[in-house]
């Protein structure tokens, strides 16, 4: 806050009056701008701004101490307010100065100079980095510094509604043309003596003078237009479009009020105060939009003024003293439009000028030397009463829109002032009020008429301008006083020419503007060239200034003078003097202003030259003016202005010295900023490289994820295929198990059948043995019979020899015997038929036996094949089970390896995360280092908020990770329990497999035993076959012998013709024999049927047992299949869950990395966006970033702790799971051992029990067989006794037959002797065959006539009887021996055929004995032949 004032002065009455003070409110950072107040303590609008508040605010913000801002206020009494109003309306600046500061002007000027010299460096020292021009202005350059940076800074922030008497608050929003200035109040045409001075640039005189050169104006305007970027344009246009519809109803009314003549200055200020509060609330964007609206309205108003007041040419001849005073007035008005120097776009900094309008009115009637410009209007004060408002952004925006809109009307940025002293009838002639002639422009296009020469040498143009103006100054003396109109017309023509030139040059500006955007790299070179050109131009200007031939121009090159209507009270010479003063003033000010644009080394020498040249110029002007205005009033004023110019030059020199120091400081700052920019570029490159690396890593991670997903899919497909194959194999195994069970049942059935076959074979072998014994006995009997027959034949021959003599007597007997023989032959034929039937039956039985044996062989072969298949399937199943077990073990190993790999991957990922964190920490440190030099407070707050969000996200993520870790721990516990259950199931399956393997071993042993037994049976069968062959051979030999015996029997029967009784007995015996034979055959058939039934029953029992065992095998296979399914399901679930857990862990880790990468990307984007803005608050950012780093370190430390805890918990759980698995494995192994031992013990006990049962059965069978043998022996004994009785009876019959034979023999001998001669031939004819053996006996002469000796016959009969008795004894002995042997063999064979009953043995013995008895009877019958 600043204030200006003066000392109190008494009025005419001498009464004290309240003082009026002018204040400016300097708002805090972030407000819209500086706001000026002019008032007195009694006003309502000024009551809220006491001096104490102003002092405190200044002391708190600027820390000036006892500087310029602590100067006393200018007190104005209420009586002088009317005069102050009139002077302000009429444009009488000296009158206003006189009212505000009636004391010595020199002292006040010195005080103001000192205050300004103190204010500028102090304000600069206390400027924050935010307020520096290089940070906020893109067109800033160190060479463009003005005399007062404070005023420049304040002029940037001025508002439209600042408190000045000539302010128009705001414009309507529908006006499109851009304006830089507030609208001034203008009087009517009859009362208007002066115009408005418009402040359109900077507040410094340096920029004013420099900008008055046309070439400088052109170059600066072009540079200003070129340095506007597209981003600023878009922002401003958007701000204008979006935020204009505010305060439209109030602004035109305010403008109309300000246009009226009678409206005072101060009543506007309360409304301005209200608008200020509204501006603070609305913000920056609304402020920009309303400023734009003000510019638009000002542009239209100035266009109307220009049309209303056509600009005539001002007189070029004015007194030198008036020009000096004019120079002071303009010097007091800080304004500069174009302070852009080419090449400043690289540093993104430029000054922006603001123009201030003064308005003076020619109603001051008492001018004097005191009415010269007061220090109150000094340019270094930063603001004046009549400052309207403008902003640096106005000028940039106007220049930009001027390039876009060529035909829109604009205003001039700088107007030179022209004071005119007029004489009144009631006042002295010496007093002439100063009139400020307003120079303005109609068109906005003319505002930028010299921008084409932006990249050209601006200073060379300025020198040419001075050269062109030199003849004008020389021609001033030659011009007559009446040449005012011609000069005005000439100036008007020049103005029109310049406007046309500007219109032609606007089109080229657009092309150059686009080219300048592409030539950013060459701007540094252009800066250096422009600096050298400025130096060269400064030397040229020093020469031109010493000659005094330069003429000043406005900042825009549009120094058009608005014509003033001459009243009746004004004279033509006054107009001339005012115009000459204007020219002299314009001649002086460019020199002073241009000195500021030169290098610091040239300022001192040039200031010395300026002081001398100014003095010479004044003297020349005095001579030229001659004696027209050399009265007592004008000469002191000229002298005062001269003194003021000297003071100003001194101030300028001092200020230039300060500027040199400041320039050096700013150059150092620029170098530092350039270094910082290079560092920021490097950091940008590093960040971009890091981004690229992170993107590559993300791409790699995504590829790895895709590959893992593909591998998982392939694994799932393989797993499904394997599961299907396993199911198919399980089904096949089930089928195989079923077939195995069926085979086992068949094996058992076949084993039983083999046992039965063995038993049957044993029986057959026994029968064969018995038959062989019988055959041997029969052979022995036949041998005996042969011997007996031979002896009988011999006896018969002897008897025939003896009975030849008795043949004749026996013819009749022979006939009888022949009949008997026929009968016997018939009987023999019947016997042969019976024998054939018996043989056929035996053959059929043999065929049946052979067929049974072949069926048994086939069955054995099938059984062997089935056993082989079973063995193969068993081996295959064993191999499959072993393979499955190996697969299970391999899968367990793979799972363990996968778990280990997962652990390793987790460790590797943790290491990578740590490395990423280290990188992130390094990157964050680098970013922090770059941020500490570049970031702003607001963006830092955003980053802090983002960091807080990230911190919250990290907390949320940590909580989520903890929850996920808990879920994973639960899943691990569930998996462990499932693994335990699976292991238990594995152990159970292993136990079942062990049991099945034991069962299979038993089956194999049984099979091996059955094979051995089968081999034994085959060997026995082969032996039996050989025996059968021998038996058949023997049977054939027996049949042959039987045939021989039959032939012999025929012979014997021929001899037994006479034994009729014997025939009858033989018939009886034959009938009995036949009955016995039939009974024996029936018994054999019954026994065979019983055996068949018993075999069928046994087969049924075996089939039942086979079915039962098959059902048990099916149950076992079903249980096995269920266990396999459980195993497969467990195998499927365990790896899938492990993979799912690994995938979740990887996804979590990737999500963490992605979140961190996203956070880093956001940070990088915010860093890149906020580089420029965050430069000014380095210290605060450092502190904040240190805190952030500490908090991040804490967060990372907490993260590490949580991760370490999670890892430890997982490792502990895994170790516990492994220990439990090991324990369970040991327990299961022990259980297996115990189960095996239990199985072995149970099997042993079962075997012992079965052995005991078998032993008990064997003992029982032995006892029963012994009893049976005893009973059979007793029966055999009884039978034997009966047979002995029968034999005794037979022997008695034989003895009787012998007696009968002896009697018959005696009778035969008698009959033979009687009928020898008669019946010899007839006997031979009738019985040739029978009588053939007796032929030799008949021829034998010796035997015919012999006598019969009966003693010899008796001896032969006795021998026969003795022989038969011996045979009977042998037979008895053999029978007893056979019975004893059969009993022993029966005892030995009872265990194999325990089911064989005693009745069957009895029947077998009877069947065996019957043919033996028959043979004996035959032999006995044969022994009964008549001897």
Swiss-Prot record:
Belongs to the CCDC144 family. This is Coiled-coil domain-containing protein 144A. Residues 1-32, 87-189, 213-261, 453-485, 528-586 are annotated as: Disordered. Keywords: Coiled coil. Residues 129-150, 167-178, 453-467 have a biased composition (Polar residues). The gene is CCDC144A. It comes from the Eukaryota. The keyword Cell inner membrane does not apply. Residues 543-552 have a biased composition (Low complexity). It comes from Homo sapiens (Human). The keyword Coiled coil applies.
